[in-house]
């Protein structure tokens, strides 16, 4: 990844960074909740973004 990024790329990376977090604990506590963890987590070394 270059140090000089276009705004489009930077915005894309920012979105992916926001998506890549665990689910909040209060969501797990909700009644009738079936979500245990965020299945769409991405590890920076294992799975690369399609850039």
From Swiss-Prot:
Gene3D superfamilies registered for this protein in UniProt: Ribosomal protein L39e
InterPro entries in the cross-refs: Ribosomal_eL39, Ribosomal_eL39_CS, Ribosomal_eL39_dom_sf
A Pfam short name: Ribosomal_L39
SUPFAM superfamilies per record: Ribosomal protein L39e
GO cellular component: cytosolic large ribosomal subunit
Sorted UniProt keywords: Ribonucleoprotein, Ribosomal protein
Keyword Ribosomal protein recorded: yes
The keyword Lipid metabolism belongs to this UniProt entry's keyword annotation: no
Entries under PANTHER family matching the protein: LARGE RIBOSOMAL SUBUNIT PROTEIN EL39, RIBOSOMAL PROTEIN L39E
Subunit structure: Interacts with IMPACT.
Protein name: Large ribosomal subunit protein eL39
Classification of source organism: Eukaryota, Metazoa, Chordata, Craniata, Vertebrata
Gene, per the UniProt record: RPL39
């Amino acid at each position: 990844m270059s140090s000089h990024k276009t705004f489009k790329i930077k915005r894309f990376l920012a979105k992916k960074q926001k998506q890549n977090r665990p689910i909040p604990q209060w969501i797990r506590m909700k009644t009738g909740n079936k979500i245990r963890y965020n299945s769409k987590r991405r590890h920076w070394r294992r799975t690369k973004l399609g850039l």
